From Swiss-Prot:
GO terms for molecular function: structural molecule activity. InterPro entries: Flagellin_arc. PANTHER family: ARCHAEAL FLAGELLA-RELATED PROTEIN F-RELATED (PTHR42200), FLAGELLA-RELATED PROTEIN G-RELATED (PTHR42200:SF1). Pfam families: Arch_flagellin (PF01917). This is Putative flagella-related protein G. The lineage of its organism: Archaea, Methanobacteriati, Methanobacteriota, Methanomada group, Methanococci. The gene is flaG.
Amino acid sequence: MIYLASSAMSEIVMFVAVLLIAAFVAGILTTSTYKISLNINKKGDALATKLSQDFEIINDPGDIVRNSSAGTIALYIKNTGKDPIIFTNDSFTVIIDGSIVEINTTNQLTSPGSNILSPGDVGEIVVNYNETGYHRIKVISECGISRIIRGYIS
């Protein structure tokens, strides 16, 4: 009789141990799934922002105008996205032939004085660059969207 009672008791202890382990594993899986879903939401929001903000470089690739006395060139940016784009010297980066060049000024041409490019608006980025010839120009926005133009600087 004692043998039967100890056998039943050990089975109960094992059963409780298995239940505790199963609850622990379920808790870990629930927490992991929650963290994954939060990260997916963050990535989705970032991607939605990136997709709703877009721009194009609208310079004529055959003749990118250079101001030789000031040592600058002008790049024209059009907001082709659905959302406004902040348009300041710090909100864009310009790379010419692999080298980052300094932005001299940004000018909102559609609504002068504004620091926002609304959808359809055109802005001018004036960069310090005084070399002629064919060049590869890359403009990158603060949210990571980049556009490239290969053109002749006259």
